[in-house]
């Protein structure tokens, strides 16, 4: 049962790397039980495989259109930062080609692991409308507040973007 569980997790990790973003968090959580899986963990994996079988037409679509910021909660932050200006050098050349926009979504759940009280970070980075980076990972530190766990997730996302 031990090696069977490891094989199933390996296949699911491969599927996540190929673009099945919708199962990234579940696979990450179940990966923490590789050393000593129980029957409930095998059943959870089989549920994921059933989900993949039912939704076998799901795929990542790479779209070159730019993001419409009207879809988000606040596209304009001038209420909070009225004097903020983007510093563009005066001798900068005119942009060529289509516009490229990167958008990053970050989230963390505070102390979601009931045993170790560690939080889990999730990052999804888009280039225009195409996801290019995604992951779900348990944080290395134990944070005492939601703000702390969100900040750790934001730091990890910033390192990926920069």
Task: Specify the residue positions occupied by each region the protein language model found.
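Divalent metal-binding acidic/histidine catalytic loops
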Residues: 1-162
């Amino acid at each position: 049962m031990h090696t069977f569980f490891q094989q199933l997790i390996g296949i699911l990790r491969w599927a996540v790397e190929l673009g099945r973003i919708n199962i990234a968090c579940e696979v990450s959580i179940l990966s923490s039980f590789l050393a000593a899986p129980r029957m409930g963990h095998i059943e959870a994996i089989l549920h994921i495989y059933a989900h993949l079988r039912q939704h076998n037409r799901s795929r990542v679509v790479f779209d070159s259109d730019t993001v419409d910021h009207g879809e988000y909660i606040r596209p304009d932050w001038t209420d909070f930062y009225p004097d903020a200006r983007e510093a563009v050098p005066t001798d900068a050349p005119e942009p060529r080609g289509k516009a490229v926009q990167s958008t990053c979504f970050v989230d963390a759940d505070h102390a979601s692991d009931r045993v170790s009280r560690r939080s889990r970070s999730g990052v999804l980075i888009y280039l225009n409308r195409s996801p290019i980076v995604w992951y779900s990972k348990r944080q290395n530190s134990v944070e005492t507040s939601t703000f702390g766990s969100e900040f750790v997730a934001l730091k990890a996302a910033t390192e990926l973007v920069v």
